[in-house]
Design a protein with these regions (language model features):
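Conserved Switch II/interswitch segment of TRAFAC-class P-loop GTPases
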Residues: 40-45, 72-82, 93-155, 168-182, ...
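Conserved G1/Walker A P-loop phosphate-binding module
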Residues: 1-111, 139-140
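C-terminal-of-GTPase-core extension/linker across diverse P-loop GTPases
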Residues: 2-6, 17, 146-352, 359, ...
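Amphipathic alpha-helical transducer elements in NTP-driven molecular machines
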Residues: 32, 46-49, 62-68, 82-96, ...
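Short, intrinsically disordered, mixed-charge
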Residues: 22, 54, 90, 94, ...
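Short capping/connector residues at structural and topological boundaries
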Residues: 6, 32, 37-40, 47-49, ...
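Glycine-rich, flexible loop/turn motifs
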Residues: 23-31, 38-40, 48-51, 80, ...
Length: 365
C-alpha cells in the first residue's frame, strides 16, 4: 500500500511524516521547506505478529508496511507552477490513497499562509489544485481520443465519458464522487489515474488539549468530520507534535505516554486503521521457524491470489492452502493440537482468505 500526504504549508504535514516514518524529513516554520517528495516506510502495528513469532520461535518477524510519500506543501496555483509547481502533484498519482493533513489548532507562533485557521477553506484550496491538475490530464486524453472518435465507436463513447468527467470537475466536484454507470466507464476511469479519484483520509492536526476527547470540543475538527462524511472519506484526529515526541520512545514508554494522555492508540495506529478501512484491506499471516510475516490483501481475496502476494509461483502452481485461525492456533498451544481438534483446514482455490488466517500454501511449478 502506498499513501501520499498533501496539505498547505505549515499545517504539520512534514512533522507528522517524520514522526510516522522516522525518516527525518526537513520540517521548519516556513513555506516550502520540503523541496523533494520524501518517501518513508511505515510499519503496520499488529500485536499478533510478536505473539505468533514467539509461538514458532521465529528468527525474524516482518510486519506489513505502508509506503508513505510526503509531498511539498501546496498553495493556490500549484497546478500552474505556483509555490513549488505541479511536478509535486505528479508525485502522488501512483498512490493508493491521499492523506490530507489539515490544521485544526490555533497557534500565533506558527504562521498560516492565508492568515487564519479555516480547515474547510484549506481543503477546498488543495482540492481545486487537484482538480486543475486532473483537467490537464483529461484535456490531453480528449485531444488524443478526438482524433479517432469519428471512425471508432468505442473511442466516441469514451470521448462522451471524458466530456462528462470534465464537466464534473469544472463544477468543482471530485471525480470520486461521480457515479459510474457501467463497466466501460469503470474501466476508462481506472486508466486515467486522476488525483480526484483517489480515496482521501483527513488527518485533523490538533493541539494536545484536544486529543483525549478526539477533538469533540474543537469546532474546526467537527467541520472536517462533516465534510469527510459528505465525501465518504475517513478522518482521524492527531497531534503531530505529540506524535513526534512519541516516535522517540521505546514501546513501553510509548504505552505509558499514551495512557498519561488518556489515549488508547497512537496516531500511527489511527492512520493504519483508517487506511485499511477506506481501502478495504486486511492481513493474513505466515509463520514458521525462519520467519513470521503479515501480508496485506484486499478483503475478498481468494487463496491463490493471496499466495501470489508472497511469490508469483505460489499463485501459478497453487494446489491448496492449509489454514488455521490465529487465535485458535495460540489457544491450542501447538499446530498439532489445532490439527487434532479439526481447526486446521485444507482449502482450495475458491477459499476467501479471512483476516488473521495463518496459512501454509501448497504449490507445484
Amino acid at each position: 500500500m502506498k499513501l501520499g500526504s498533501v496539505g498547505l504549508p505549515n499545517v504539520g504535514k512534514s512533522t507528522l511524516f517524520n514522526s510516522l516514518t522516522k525518516a527525518g524529513a526537513e520540517s521548519a516554520n516556513y513555506p516550502f521547506c520540503t523541496i523533494d517528495p520524501n518517501v518513508g516506510v511505515v510499519t503496520v502495528p499488529d500485536e499478533r505478529l510478536a505473539l505468533l513469532g514467539d509461538f514458532y520461535h521465529s528468527k525474524k518477524v516482518t510486519p506489513a508496511v505502508i509506503e508513505f510519500v510526503d509531498i511539498a506543501g501546496l498553495v493556490k496555483g500549484a497546478s500552474k507552477g505556483e509555490g513549488l509547481g505541479n511536478q509535486f502533484l505528479a508525485n502522488i498519482r501512483e498512490v493508493d490513497a491521499i492523506v490530507h493533513v489539515v490544521r485544526c489548532f490555533e497557534d500565533t507562533n506558527v504562521i498560516h499562509v492565508d492568515g487564519s485557521i479555516d480547515p474547510i477553506r484549506d481543503i477546498e484550496t488543495i482540492n481545486l489544485e487537484l482538480i486543475f491538475s486532473d483537467l490537464e490530464i483529461l484535456e490531453r486524453r480528449i485531444a488524443k481520443v478526438t482524433k479517432t472518435a469519428r471512425m471508432d465507436k468505442e473511442a466516441a463513447k469514451e470521448l462522451d465519458f471524458l466530456q462528462k468527467i470534465k464537466k464534473w470537475l469544472e463544477d468543482g466536484k471530485m471525480a470520486i464522487t461521480m457515479e459510474l454507470e457501467n463497466e466501460d466507464e469503470e474501466a476508462w476511469m481506472g486508466t486515467y489515474n486522476l488525483l480526484t479519484q483517489k480515496p482521501v483520509i483527513y488527518a485533523a492536526n490538533v493541539a494536545e488539549d484536544d486529543l483525549a476527547n478526539d477533538g469533540a470540543d474543537n469546532a474546526h475538527v467537527q467541520a472536517v468530520r462533516k465534510y469527510a462524511a459528505e465525501q465518504n472519506s475517513e478522518i482521524f484526529v492527531i497531534c503531530a507534535q505529540i506524535e513526534e515526541e512519541i516516535s522517540e520512545l521505546d514501546e513501553d514508554e510509548r504505552k505509558m505516554f499514551l495512557e498519561d494522555l488518556g489515549l488508547k492508540e497512537s496516531g500511527l495506529e489511527k492512520l493504519v486503521k483508517a487506511s485499511y478501512h477506506l481501502l478495504g484491506l486486511m492481513s493474513f499471516l505466515t509463520s514458521g521457524e525462519d520467519e513470521t510475516r503479515a501480508w496485506t490483501i484486499k478483503i475478498g481475496t481468494k487463496a491463490p491470489q493471496a499466495a501470489g502476494k508472497i511469490h508469483s509461483d505460489f499463485e501459478r502452481g497453487f494446489i491448496k492452502a492449509e489454514v488455521v485461525n490465529y487465535q485458535d492456533l495460540l489457544d491450542c498451544g501447538s499446530y498439532a493440537g489445532a490439527r487434532e481438534k479439526g481447526l486446521v483446514r485444507m482449502e482450495g482455490k475458491d477459499y476467501v482468505v479471512q483476516d488473521g488466517d495463518v496459512i501454509l500454501f501448497r504449490f507445484n511449478v
